[in-house]
Amino acid sequence: APQTIDYVASFVDGIGGRSVLAEMWPLVRQLVNGSLVVSVNEVAAAVRLLAERNRVIAEGAGAAPLAVALAHADTAKPVACVVSGGNLDSEVLARILRNETL
């Protein structure tokens, strides 16, 4: 059964939440065999890396796959990350680029 977790609002608002919808749980159980967690600071670092090195502006949820790949780079398996979304508040982006606390 789905579990309810603590949720803290952040700029990574496109993913996450308190739980999976009950109707979706059977599908999730079939398709997902695990999950990885990163901090908001790790996602901010991924947003900054994408902006500075690749000139790509990704929203928090869009940069989360890169944050996970960087946090778990010790695995020997190839990784592909889908980076998406540019819906990031300009002030939040500026704070990320200045490496300020969010």
What is each residue range found by the language model?
Residues 1-102:
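PLP-dependent amino-acid enzyme catalytic core
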